[in-house]
């Protein structure tokens, strides 16, 4: 059976991340204001689901999903500010993959 895990940050996650990292944090049209309740959507299709809001609930929710004999949707709420790495920048090749967030550079005044 299929198990689905939605990493739900309430945004178009990779689009928001690109805008943050490559477009000077100019966010445009990335917040999902009308996103449906994923758990209720799963039930509408006839299978079980659960929403997790706290990291402390994740292990038990994953175990519940694995133990379910049929399909299962786990909707995990995550911070909209968490980024996902590795990623390939716009127009970049695989050998230009970004493996971690850019580190701030200290600039000293002369």
List each language-model region with its residue ranges.
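Thiamine diphosphate
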Residues: 1-110
């Amino acid at each position: 059976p299929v198990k689905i895990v939605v990493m739900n940050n309430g945004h178009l996650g990779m689009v928001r991340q690109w805008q943050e990292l490559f477009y000077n944090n100019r966010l445009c049209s990335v917040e999902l204001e009308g996103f449906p309740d994923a758990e209720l959507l799963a039930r509408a299709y006839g299978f079980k689901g659960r929403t997790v809001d706290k990291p402390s609930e994740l292990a038990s929710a994953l175990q519940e999903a694995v133990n379910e004999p049929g399909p299962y949707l786990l909707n995990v709420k995550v911070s909209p500010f968490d980024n996902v790495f590795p990623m390939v920048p716009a127009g970049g090749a695989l050998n230009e993959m970004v493996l971690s967030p850019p580190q701030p550079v200290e600039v000293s005044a002369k």
